[in-house]
Each structure stands twice: as structure tokens, then as C-alpha cells.
């Protein structure tokens, strides 16, 4: 049951049916949608509360932490790495190490936004235009490094 709850929560981030990314979308579209969904999701009050509980309980119940990672963040990283590999094979990107590229992109999205929400009482996450601007900048940064070879 716990595994299914976490899997469904991670599906909200990818935004696709059953949590799958649009494997035929352009990198800019897929990364932009994923980035915005992720940033919105991880800065929500309920997501921050859930994350706090997971960090606290994973020490006491390691299996809970493993399930959380596998069905949550690990699933999102894996789905993105799979997409990046496909886009590279189509010539839309140049990602020799899709797993690393996925972690770097999602790290740029998360930045310090989740940490602020976790430890700063009353933190008000940025919304709207500022959130979109953050995601667009992360996408531009990613494409500058991993865009197709010229």
C-alpha cells in the first residue's frame, strides 16, 4: 500500500499516464513540463510534511526509505534517464550518460527550494512567473550542455 501511494505521488510529477514521460515530446517540452511539475509538487506543504516523515522514519525503518526512494525519486530519475537516452538516440540531445544528466537536471530544478521549505518555517515558495523562469533557466542550462552536437 505504501509503495503504491509513493508511486502515485511520483506519477503526479511526470504528468503522464501511469507516471510515464512523453517519450515523443521535444526535450524543451518534456524538461519544461517535468521541471514545473516537480517544483510545484516538492514545495507543496503536504509534500514537505511527507518528506520530513520519510527522512525521520528511514533511520528507524530502512525498508521504508528504500521503498520511498525506489517508487518516488528513483522512479522519476529513471524515467527521465530513459527519456534522455531515447532523445539522444533520435539525435535531439547528446547525453552520453543519461543517468547523470537526469540527476543534474533535477538537481537544478530542486536547487535549494525544497530545503528552504523543509527547514524555514513560514517559507513561501515562489509561484507563477518566478517559478516558470527558474524552470526555463534550468532547461536552458541543460540544453546548453546536452543539446545536439553541432
Predicted feature descriptions by range:
Residues 16-20, 52-56, 69, 119-125:
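Short linear capping/connector segments at secondary-structure termini
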Residues 95:
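Short beta-strand "wing" residues that participate in macromolecule-binding interfaces
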Residues 4, 13, 117-118:
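Residues that scaffold the ATP/ADP-binding catalytic core of kinase and kinase-like folds
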Residues 29, 40-49, 53-55, 63-89, ...:
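Amphipathic alpha-helical packing segments from all-alpha helical-bundle domains
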Residues 1-9:
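Alpha-helical DNA-contacting segments of helix-turn-helix folds
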Residues 9, 15-51, 98-105:
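Hydrophobic alpha-helical connector segments
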Residues 33, 37, 74, 78, ...:
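C-terminal peripheral helix-coil segments that are non-catalytic and often amphipathic
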